[in-house]
Amino acid sequence: MMRLLSFDDSDFGAALGAIVARGETPPEGVEETVAEILEAVRLQGDRALLEYTTRFDGLDLTAAQLQVTAEEIEAALAAVDSESMAALQLAADRIAAFHRRQKTETWLTTDEQDVMLGQMVQPLERVGIYVPGGKASYPSSVLMNAIPAKVAGVAEVVMVVPMPHGEVNPHVLAAAHLAGVDRIFKIGGAQAVAALAYGTESVPRVDKITGPGNIYVATAKKMVFGQVDIDMIAGPSEILVINDGSGTPEHIAVDLLSQAEHDELAAAILVTTDADFGRRVQQAVEEQLATLKRAAIARCSIDAFGAILVARDLEQAVALSNSIAPEHLELAVDDPFSLLPRIRHAGAIFMGHHCPEAAGDYLAGPNHTLPTGGTARFFSPLGVDDFVKKSSIISFSREGLDRLGRSIVHLAELEGLEAHGRSVSIRLKDS
């Protein structure tokens, strides 16, 4: 059962600290295993990739069979019913519409010293997206990662998805088709991250890797960062709900469970100013949990990392939320927009009683790839900016250099960099 605590309880700090710190350290041996896999794929290419695919996924392939064929995609499309395809198309359209509003363009300006300055915005050339695989997989992750890349103008999107024993959810391939993914490979785990980061005979090297995965995938992304860009270091999912005693306890309960069912390390926290409402949510969680297919996973999460916290007022609730910087924040209050200016740190903010977090997971439009583990203090949701790079443009006319050159020389002399200053002064003499 979810713990119910007051801010004044003696064990409040310890209980909250345990929730916030969950999953910070990889289990023993993970980093060593991942390092070994990365090095093997870097040195041996397809040979190591195929060996790990056989060992971990039970899928015995040749190099020629690594890539999903057009025929396999057509078969997947045929296996998806019309209602599911319509829902995927609706989600794709809404995600694309939202992300098109994020686009920035190249710009140039000339200042009062006759110096032209600007910024050139260019898409990355090739991006890799990791999608969890098997039968219990997530087509929404395909849409959320591939569509912003395509909106940004990325020329080639390469997707990797593990197919244990050859099984893949056809909805994942259908989503890839709708999102415009260019190539799909039947690989997963740290070995797939390595293939994308270093390239193999069959899998092209990419400029950036995005997408969720297990602890081995997350650790691999962390280790290859610097040789290739990544979206973020994602940890276990989390939700924090701020409530003022209004609304329906059953609604809040199932919102909390929507995160708890993700995995055993997911965190679900309700901060309410109404202790009686909190107790009703506590009971509703138990009633709802018993009916879930993933009840065992949700039970582990709720018991270990679930909490109902009773705050003195909404100011105290908001302060706690800002200190946690949750991935998902629901403002389940009568007037959510009055609280919004006080929210400093959150990955996504869901406003009011009719906006469950699941709406953002699937088709509201904003990205569901969000910073976790308190990193919303400095990370943002995945978006178009993650798939572009920017170059500064600087153009001095002769007159512009005449006006600013002596100050440039002076600053170079302050730093003792003689050639820097001379590269300007020699031009001033020639003008």
From Swiss-Prot:
One of its GO terms (molecular function) is histidinol dehydrogenase activity. Its cofactor is Zn(2+). It catalyses: L-histidinol + 2 NAD(+) + H2O = L-histidine + 2 NADH + 3 H(+). GO terms for biological process: L-histidine biosynthetic process. CDD domains: Histidinol_dh. NAD(+) binds at Y130, Q191, N214. Pathway: Amino-acid biosynthesis; L-histidine biosynthesis; L-histidine from 5-phospho-alpha-D-ribose 1-diphosphate: step 9/9. Binds 1 zinc ion per subunit. Keywords: Amino-acid biosynthesis, Histidine biosynthesis, Metal-binding, NAD, Oxidoreductase, Zinc. Zn(2+) binds at Q259, H262, D361, H420. GO terms for cellular component: cytosol. It holds the Pfam family Histidinol_dh. It is an enzyme of class 1 (oxidoreductase). Its EC number is 1.1.1.23. It comes from the Bacteria. Substrate binds at S237, Q259, H262, H328, D361, E415, H420. The active site is at E327, H328. Catalyzes the sequential NAD-dependent oxidations of L-histidinol to L-histidinaldehyde and then to L-histidine. Belongs to the histidinol dehydrogenase family. This is Histidinol dehydrogenase. The gene is hisD.
